[in-house]
């Protein structure tokens, strides 16, 4: 993921700050904000950032109610969060990501995806045991990319797979100009 100095990045479901810290380490000139609903986890993230002197802000909040102004981020990232959300909450969270992204901004999601082989279906079983069968079902059915496009994003691409192919890396772009028939966060 290419980022330019001065860009603003939001990490939805930042947890203990691992992804936010990695982004800041690789791109020290970007402004990184993490958001998570767990205060104890956010305390851990803040301690980790202070320990390495990384200027990262961690806010308390939810993916489906982002406390940020419209068009305030150049990138929105999320790692292993969406499979935890109910289908209707996924839709609202994606609309919120769309809302806070600037036109031309990018959404990057790493999350459980549809298995492509019998081996991948077996490999995902421990993941499902840990996170719950119900929590992962929607993503394993391949619905997340459809929801991303239905939200109004363009240029959706699966840019790779990790963890034995279980986790898909998705990138999509908020259009620079929205047409009247395109779904937005207000539809």
Question: Predicted regions span which residues?
Answer:
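C-terminal lobe and adjacent flexible extensions of AdoMet/dcAdoMet transferase-like proteins
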Residues: 169-187
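A short acidic, Gly/Pro-enriched loop at the edge of an enzyme's catalytic core
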Residues: 64-75
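Conserved alpha-helix/loop element of class I SAM-dependent methyltransferases that forms part
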Residues: 1-5
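A short SAM/SAH-binding and catalytic strip from SAM-dependent methyltransferases
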Residues: 75-88
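A short glycine-rich, Lys/Arg-flanked "PGG" loop and its adjoining helix->strand segment in the class I
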Residues: 91-103
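Class I SAM-dependent methyltransferase SAM/SAH-binding core
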Residues: 10-12, 16-65
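C-terminal alpha-helical "lid/dimerization" subdomain adjacent to the S-adenosyl-L-methionine
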Residues: 25, 108-151, 155-168
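Short glycine-centered segments of the SAM/dcSAM-binding site in methyltransferase folds
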Residues: 8, 104-106
């Amino acid at each position: 993921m290419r980022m330019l100095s001065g860009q603003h990045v939001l990490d939805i479901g930042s947890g203990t700050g691992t992804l936010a810290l990695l982004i800041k380490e690789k791109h020290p000139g970007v402004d990184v904000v993490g958001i998570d609903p767990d205060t104890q986890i956010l305390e851990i993230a803040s301690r980790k950032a202070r320990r390495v002197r990384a200027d990262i802000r961690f806010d308390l909040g939810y993916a489906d109610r982002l406390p940020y102004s419209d068009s305030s981020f150049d990138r929105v990232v999320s790692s292993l969060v969406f499979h935890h959300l109910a289908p209707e909450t996924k839709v609202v969270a994606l609309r919120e990501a769309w809302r806070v992204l600037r036109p031309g901004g990018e959404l990057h999601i790493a999350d459980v995806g549809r298995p492509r082989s019998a081996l991948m279906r077996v490999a995902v079983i421990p993941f499902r045991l840990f996170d719950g069968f119900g929590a992962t079902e929607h993503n394993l059915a391949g619905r997340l990319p459809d929801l991303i496009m239905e939200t109004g994003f363009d240029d959706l691409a699966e840019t790779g797979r990790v963890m034995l192919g279980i986790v898909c890396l998705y990138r999509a772009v908020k259009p620079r100009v929205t047409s009247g028939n395109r779904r937005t966060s207000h539809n």
